[in-house]
Amino acid sequence: MQLPIELKQAIDNNAFCAIATKINEKEVQNHLMWVDYREDRILINTEQGRKKTKNIRQEPNISVVIFHPNDMYTCWEIRGVVENIVQDSSANDHIDYLSNRYSGKPYGRSKDVTWEEAGFTSREIWEIDVNKVISMVSRAQSKSEPE
């Protein structure tokens, strides 16, 4: 599925997202994350060995809500499936790219310290095939009518 250009522009301008992964039949886990895309796949970068990495391996379906960086009432809900998990050094490079984009410096360290010197746990990238995009556009706030 093709991602809307407005969504790609929001991501390029440092939109944040909330991801939801399924823990079990009764529980869902949510996280606020940085987000990226490649072509028409959503990319999520996370530390290997986290609870959410276990969740996604048990149930690869995922929901991602991406908030417009200048208007939190404009957002996109992405429903999709994690189709590929990248676990090589490119995932570490990718988190540095995201950290530079979002915060102006490499991930969790100064520019003169390498990934290996910092002793960080390796990263992984989830490549999400998008099945559905629901756009929610900001509109003037009004009182809700009683149901």
Language-model segment annotations:
Residues 25-27, 70-72, 116-120:
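A short beta-turn/loop motif at secondary-structure boundaries
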Residues 11-12, 57-58, 119:
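Alpha-helix boundary recognition
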Residues 50-52, 71, 142-143:
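Short, surface-exposed beta-strand-loop junctions and turns on beta-sheet-rich folds
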Residues 14-48, 56, 63-66, 76-78:
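Short beta-strand segments
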Residues 2, 75-147:
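Charged, gly/pro-rich active-site loop segments
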Residues 1-17, 145-147:
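Extreme N-terminal tail/first-helix region
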Residues 47-51, 102:
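Short, solvent-exposed aromatic-acidic interface loops
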